[in-house]
Every structure is written in structure tokens, then in C-alpha cells.
């Protein structure tokens, strides 16, 4: 399902700030697998996820996902196949947009978007139903700006958004690290 073959990435090449972030990294992940990458700060865990997500292009090697060679695909194209939740609960959402608008964007990820209304009656009903599965009472607050929510609520919504279209791969980058213990427990429960 995911095959990473010999990828390498060096930042700031030929400068005093040159950093070899990834060197000849390879792994195979079968469909339905769950992989945890453990390492010290600065060891390249987030960099590896960024490489898979397409935040930057790797210097060498290849990345294949669900039978597609995605090594040179831009990030927005990979978004059709990859859902992602960042460590910072404020990174996965647009704070000035409503909960409904954020979710509508997630529901249309990977498709062309026109300038018409993102949330109509049929979409609103689906949003409400899915948000209610979080058991946080947010289904009654769909018009609230997402920026007014707690970190735990935002992270739960980000997880819902990342998994909305059943991605081939879901990347979770220390997705509970910035949360209080109660919120972290709620988000971990949703992850399962």
C-alpha cells in the first residue's frame, strides 16, 4: 500500500545550515497496517511524514501509494489519497471559517471547487450527522467559527476532516501532544 524506497532529503544544501534530514529511508506498509515511528526530537519523524504528504520533494528515492507513483506529485494532488492531522491543533483548520465551512472543504478535498455555496441543506445534514459522532455537542454549533473552539475540539474535528473521504493513508503527527490529558484521551479514542 505504501512503499518508500531509498528517499533522501537535505535542506539548505551547500550552506552553513545544511541539514541531512533523511538518508536512504525505505519502508513497506501493507494495507490496514498501523505504524508508529519513534525517535528523539530532530530525528526526522515529521520530515518523513512531510515527504510522504508532499510538503517538499525528496532529493532521491521514490514514494508509491496505493499503486500510484506519487514521488513528484504536488501536495494538493496527494491530498486525494492522504489525510493528515498535525501536532498543533491550530494547523489543520481555517480559524475564521465556520465548523460547517471547514468540514465542507474536507468533504470536497481533491475535487474542483467552484465559487458557489459550500454548505447547502443536503450537505448540512451530512455534516451534522458526522459531527455528532464526536459526542462533543458540536453538531449544534456548525455556524461557530472553528477558531472559537478548544484545542481538543479542533483536533477532533481535524481528525474527522482528515478521515472524511476514507484516505488510502492517514498521517498522524503527534496529534495529541499539544492537548490536555482529557482532550488527548478523547482524540485517541476517535483515532481507534
Where are these regions (language model features)?
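Conserved ABC transporter NBD signature motif
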Residues: 61-69
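ABC ATPase C-loop
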Residues: 162-163
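Helix-to-loop junction immediately C-terminal to a conserved catalytic motif
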Residues: 53
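Walker B catalytic motif
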Residues: 174-175
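The feature captures the beta-strand-to-loop junction immediately N-terminal to the Walker
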Residues: 38-40
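A short, flexible loop at the N-terminus of ABC-type nucleotide-binding domains that lies
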Residues: 1-4, 10-24, 36, 74
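Q-loop/switch helix immediately C-terminal to the Walker
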Residues: 96-112
